[in-house]
Amino acid sequence: MTDADTRTATTDWQAWQESWDRQQEWYMPDREERFRIMLDMVEAVVGTAPRVLDLACGTGSITARLLARFPDATSTGVDLDPALLAIAEGTFAGDDRVTLVTADLKDPDWPARLPYESYDAVLTATALHWLHREPLAELYGRLAGLVRDGGVFMNADHMIDETTPRINAAERAQRHARMEQARQSGVLGWTEWWQLAAKDPVLAGPTARRYEIYGDHADGDTPSVQWHARVLREKGFGEARPVWCSPSDTLLLAMK
């Protein structure tokens, strides 16, 4: 099946979105709260009709919630994953508020693929831990050039404080115990979800290409909140601090 066939196939894209949400919530039961606070801060800083870059957009989870809350917003989603982009393309087909771009964030020239030179807000969630610190720092420098003055960048992700190993171990044990209970009730984990996608007649091709790019999972990094805030300031943002956190994750906001 070609990419054109994927975009025009009759498929329940919303069902795939919901399946992705359930799989992600298995890891992050407070995922919706992160999104709510993220959009609260978008409204607080840049208003209700922002031009947004959904960075490493995946299926477009941020974009969907952005447009539901702010109908006058526009979103550019950028990702490299063919399968997740196929779901995003199917979901937002015909919506001229959404542009989807295929690009590798490790490519220094990826911003040239975007339809705009600047954005009010760049938003990302549970994605940039796939990058090691050096390419992530380089990415932060490029983002500083994309966010307009007074605009924001927000990253919701795993940010580990390595100075608190006992607290980290206790949190990790509790989280994994909860995840095991959920698995016994039939919740799909990461591997099972991708196995399901590989069997779908529409997503099988994009999923195969996805594995050619990434393998089973990328080997990334989870530096501390302090590291992220320091590097963002060094790369051109004026302010940076957490605006929400859970025992394992943080939503960090940087203002240009």
PLM segments and residue spans:
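A short glycine-rich, Lys/Arg-flanked "PGG" loop and its adjoining helix->strand segment in the class I
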Residues: A137-D149
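Class I SAM-dependent methyltransferase SAM/SAH-binding core
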Residues: L53, S61-D109
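Conserved class I S-adenosyl-L-methionine
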Residues: M1-G47, S61-R65, M154-G186
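A conserved beta-strand element that flanks and buttresses the S-adenosyl-L-methionine
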Residues: L123
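Conserved S-adenosyl-L-methionine
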Residues: A56
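Short alpha-helix
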Residues: G220-K235
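Core SAM-dependent methyltransferase catalytic element
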Residues: K235-K256
